[in-house]
Swiss-Prot record:
Its cofactor is FMN. This is NAD(P)H dehydrogenase (quinone). Its EC number is 1.6.5.2. NAD(+) binds at residue 12. GO terms for molecular function: flavin adenine dinucleotide binding; FMN binding; NAD binding; NADH:ubiquinone reductase (non-electrogenic) activity; NADP binding; NADPH dehydrogenase (quinone) activity. Keywords: Flavoprotein, FMN, NAD, NADP, Nucleotide-binding, Oxidoreductase. Binds 1 FMN per monomer. GO terms for cellular component: membrane. FMN binds at residues 10-15, 78-80, 113-119, 134. It comes from Methylobacterium sp. (strain 4-46). PROSITE patterns: FLAVODOXIN_LIKE. SUPFAM superfamilies: Flavoproteins. It comes from the Bacteria.
Amino acid sequence: MAKVLVLYYSTYGHIEQMAHAVAEGAREAGAEVDVKRVPELVPEDVARKSHFKLDQSAPLARVDELPNYDAIIFGTPTRYGNMASQMKNFLDQTGGLWMKGALVGKVGSVFTSSASQHGGQESTILSFHTVLLHHGMVLVGLPYAFQGQLGVSQVMGNSPYGASTIADGDGSRQPSPIELDGARYQGRHVAGIAAKLAG
């Protein structure tokens, strides 16, 4: 049985919803799954005034626990085509793990959200992949075997790089059923590959 960590940062709750869908999919594949988040960096009074979702139940992750997992599925909103600073801050603390090669051979995967269809989802995931490659992780995306990323009949996220959702500029759009299905599929897919690699 693979041990999977879903590690995310969510400002308004979109990535939080996707994270739980990813975890659900990984559990369906028989994995042992933990869902954790990285710390908020924005001062609490500013976050409250900006209507951040501060009641997220997932516990905070610690850098030193990352090697305990066979796979880590990361979730971050897009910030100008890159990961959020909260996630980058957490990853910047993994230098000690890099020095030891502690994540070499682990499965890494990424899901994201953006305000618009062209808001940088793919560049966010691809730039995130650079960090995972430096750690020697095995990259897994969302294959076209998931049919929910095909077609243009509706506004939707998801790409072969990873599951995604579109939040709209004011955050009013919630993850759609097809986007959540993509997240669940990615969770199942990653868990299945991690189980094979873990032997």
